[in-house]
């Protein structure tokens, strides 16, 4: 390992969500359903958008990339958590812990930026509809996605750069089901005040700036929708409602953990479940239930397969 001689810890012990065997079985059943539904739902969205020509638009291109991020985010810690429910001593190697930190912050940072890109797409579609096809071309969408991934990776690397070489000489118990960055930093055998400030500044900057950008964007869009005729605004309002719901449910716990990362309460580990396990499920549920185009494409795909089986 590439850390100092003081760093004697080679693995971390994850305390998980509960020591009760009954609760662990209950959590296993619930989170297994959530995990499978999340992965299959997001895969279904990608498949539908890829094969339905009516969904060949910038909004759905960005949505398919959001689904891909959610699939990746579903797999960074949830499978291990499900296995750990049946293991008495839940451990993770130092390298595995650092990998979890890197993957989580990469995907979270990327998703934040992608949500901003989707808000911009809706702004152009509703407030400047005549220029939509000119502005929101394929090249710009690829640039948006590339920037989202670049920001996510840089955000994660900036965290990992000062975490990987911290001296960990014990204790090594992380009071969560995954390696949460603030909890890991607190285990370092040194004064971590400056590290905590750096984490707060880094995470707070990206989360608050993205959230404020989204709030401003959707406020302008809602004003634009209200100024339009009622007949032309219902579909736009339905799409906006789905987007705003995703933003609120995603950024709510996200800002809580990012702005107050080192002030921990017993309920925090259960909020982290929503943040890491349930958030990837929001995309397929909200977009499939509230988006008429996606629902129509789902039924079309279903009927196509049913007819092919009959023939």
From Swiss-Prot:
Q: Per UniProt, which keywords does this protein have?
A: Cell membrane, Disulfide bond, G-protein coupled receptor, Glycoprotein, Membrane, Olfaction, Receptor, Sensory transduction, Transducer, Transmembrane, Transmembrane helix
Residue ranges crossing the lipid bilayer per the database entry: 26-49, 58-79, 101-120, 140-158, 196-219, 236-258, 270-289
Membrane association type: Multi-pass membrane protein
Glycosylated residues: list them.
5
Q: Give all cystine bridges in this chain.
A: 97-189
- Where is this chain's protein located in or outside the cell? Cell membrane
GO CC terms on record? plasma membrane
| Source organism superkingdom | Eukaryota
Topology: which residues are Cytoplasmic? 50-57, 121-139, 220-235, 290-311
Principal cellular location given in the protein's record: membrane
Q: Which GO terms describe its molecular function?
A: G protein-coupled receptor activity; olfactory receptor activity
Sequence ranges on the Extracellular membrane side? 1-25, 80-100, 159-195, 259-269
Query: What CDD domains does UniProt report for this protein, alphabetically?
Result: 7tmA_OR4-like (cd15226)
Q: Which SUPFAM superfamilies match?
A: Family A G protein-coupled receptor-like
Record's function text: Odorant receptor.
Q: Which family does it belong to?
A: Belongs to the G-protein coupled receptor 1 family.
Which PANTHER family does this one have? Answer: OLFACTORY RECEPTOR
Q: What is this protein called?
A: Olfactory receptor 4K1
Species of origin reads: Homo sapiens
Gene name per UniProt: OR4K1
